[in-house]
């Protein structure tokens, strides 16, 4: 299971390269086509997901905003993550990622909330959580989903892979899997 999760972000990049588009371009097209809006709550990615979503012209049609909730206090105050969940599970957990995605969706009144939390390294300040452990979550009117990833590489590589995986999750939610049937 962990082996397939490690390669998740590579999968999206490979599939989209086959059709000649980057993840950012494909996600932008799908968001515009659907008329849906998105907001992002980021911890370990520090704004990378928001940056990628706004890299395309016309991103104001679908990107409402984001919060970099690097500190636990911001997760609680701005996103409504229960302090008890952070205390019990640490900020790097499925439940925190889910609460972040649901919180940003609710706060910014968007169709989709996307989040990422994890340990980028080079050391872990949340033992016993290993470096590379990442949770991404997506909240929509249809419900909330999450993925646990075990990423490898340098701090920068882990952050980039986490951002790519989050965009991949958004791509799948928006119907990106239909692209697979055209290949």
Stretches with model-predicted labels:
Residues 2-183:
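Short alpha-helical segments enriched in small residues
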């Amino acid at each position: 299971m962990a082996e397939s999760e490690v390669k998740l972000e590579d999968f999206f990049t490979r599939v989209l390269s086959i059709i000649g588009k980057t993840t950012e371009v494909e996600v932008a097209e799908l968001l515009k086509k659907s008329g849906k809006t998105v907001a992002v709550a980021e911890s370990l990615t520090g704004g990378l997901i928001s940056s990628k979503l706004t890299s395309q012209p016309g991103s104001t049609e679908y990107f409402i905003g984001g919060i970099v909730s690097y500190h636990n206090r911001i997760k609680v105050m701005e996103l409504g993550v229960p302090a008890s969940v952070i205390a019990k599970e640490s900020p790097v957990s499925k439940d925190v990622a889910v609460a972040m995605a649901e919180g940003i969706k609710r706060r910014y009144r968007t169709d989709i909330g996307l989040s990422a939390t994890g340990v980028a390294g080079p050391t872990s300040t949340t033992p016993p959580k290993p470096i590379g452990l990442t949770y991404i979550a997506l909240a929509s009117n249809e419900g909330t989903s999450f993925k646990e990833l075990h990423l490898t590489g340098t701090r920068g590589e882990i952050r980039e892979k986490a951002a790519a995986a989050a965009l991949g999750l958004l791509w799948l939610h928006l119907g990106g899997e239909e692209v697979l049937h055209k290949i």
